[in-house]
Amino acid sequence: MTLPKILDVIQMDDSSLSEEIIAIKRQLFDLRLKRATRQDFKPHLFKHSKHRLAQLLTVEKSRAQSN
C-alpha cells in the first residue's frame, strides 16, 4: 500500500475535507486503542494515517490563509 498523494486532497471541497479529517482522527484513535488493549492491528496504518492527516491539515490551513 503506497502513501496517499496530496493531489487527491487538493481536489476535495471544504466539507469533504473536514469530514475526512474527522474520520482519520477517529481511525488513529481506534488504532491507539487497539495497541493499548493488545488487540490485532496493522502498525503500518499509523504511518499512513498520520501522513494523510498531515496532508489534510496542510491543505485546510493553506485554504484558510488564502481566504
Swiss-Prot record:
HAMAP family linked to this entry: Ribosomal_uL29
The alphabetized list of GO BP terms reads: translation
Q: Which InterPro entries match?
A: Ribosomal_protein_uL29, Ribosomal_uL29, Ribosomal_uL29_CS, Ribosomal_uL29_sf
Its cellular-component GO annotations read:
chloroplast; cytosolic large ribosomal subunit
Provenance organism: Porphyra purpurea
**PANTHER family listed in its UniProt record:** 60S RIBOSOMAL PROTEIN L35/50S RIBOSOMAL PROTEIN L29, LARGE RIBOSOMAL SUBUNIT PROTEIN UL29C
Q: Which gene encodes it?
A: rpl29
Keywords, in A-Z order: Chloroplast, Plastid, Ribonucleoprotein, Ribosomal protein
Spell out the PROSITE patterns in the cross-references: RIBOSOMAL_L29 (PS00579)
The molecular function terms in GO held by this entry are: structural constituent of ribosome
Q: What is this protein called?
A: Large ribosomal subunit protein uL29c
